[in-house]
């Protein structure tokens, strides 16, 4: 599997965002990977958190996240994996003919994932203006980056774009809304066409609506990537559930792209 080849062949790649839906269970992680493969997704994405790098023992949750009696630090500690576990996650994804991606939030997470062979880097909206963090990646890796812009105004997006154009890494600028779930009135699907006109790079959409309709409509634009949170069941409690779709919905989106490509590939003439 090759990132550039996928885009050339499929035009629009699908990124299954697992996020924290595994709830710290390595067994769940591998179940998610297998289900993503069955759905036909191209990239499986996680979040590489390290509590010591991102939080303190006194750090409390600002919004309700878990029913467990734990601090934010303890939560991130429970969510993190060892280097060996990350290697097994990456290996499993590649064995299932998909690419491995993860959001990074610290220099440590960058170094760990670089050593195990990450395929696609992800910069979350909250880190998109941390150019030093992005520079840590571009200094040691030529792998592509997905950069979300859910917390940025237009001037800030311009700054990110200009910075990335000075680097050799392929990158996709991702429109998204940092609201979970995103209200339909706030999604701003018009931003996709504005990005496509304004920026000389690949454009994508990171969806947090928790619906099937919004990503389907987004795919009607000439975007190169769709990132979407997935869960096994919308009835199970998880911080990401309201912003996620199910794997059956994910399979629908993957099949929708395949069918759309076939339709546009086989044109007919009324002149015969």
Feature-to-residue mapping (PLM):
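Catalytic cores and adjacent flexible loops of soluble metabolic enzymes
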Residues: 1-272
């Amino acid at each position: 599997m090759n990132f550039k080849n996928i885009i050339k062949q499929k035009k629009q790649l699908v990124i299954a965002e697992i996020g924290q839906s595994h709830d710290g269970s390595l067994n769940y992680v591998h179940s998610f990977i297998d289900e993503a493969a069955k759905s036909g997704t191209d990239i499986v994405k996680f979040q590489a958190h390290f509590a010591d790098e991102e939080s303190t023992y006194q750090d409390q949750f600002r919004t309700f996240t878990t029913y467990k009696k734990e601090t934010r630090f303890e939560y991130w500690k429970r969510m993190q994996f060892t280097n060996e576990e990350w290697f097994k996650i990456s290996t499993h994804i590649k064995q299932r003919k998909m690419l491995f991606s993860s959001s990074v939030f610290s220099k440590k997470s960058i170094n760990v994932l670089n050593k195990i062979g990450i395929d696609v880097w992800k910069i979350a909206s909250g880190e998109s203006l941390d150019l030093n963090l992005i520079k840590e990646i571009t200094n040691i890796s030529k792998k592509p980056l997905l950069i979300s812009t859910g917390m940025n105004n237009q001037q800030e997006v311009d700054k990110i774009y200009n910075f990335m154009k000075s680097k050799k890494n392929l990158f996709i600028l991702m429109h998204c809304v940092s609201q979970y779930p995103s209200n339909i009135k706030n999604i701003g699907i018009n931003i996709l066409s504005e990005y496509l006109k304004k920026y000389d790079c690949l454009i994508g959409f990171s969806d947090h609506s928790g619906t099937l309709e919004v990503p389907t409509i987004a795919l009607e634009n000439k975007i190169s990537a769709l990132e979407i949170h997935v869960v096994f069941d919308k009835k199970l409690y998880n911080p990401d559930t309201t912003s996620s779709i199910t794997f059956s919905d994910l399979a629908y989106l993957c099949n929708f792209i395949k069918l759309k490509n076939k339709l546009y590939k086989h044109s007919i003439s009324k002149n015969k």
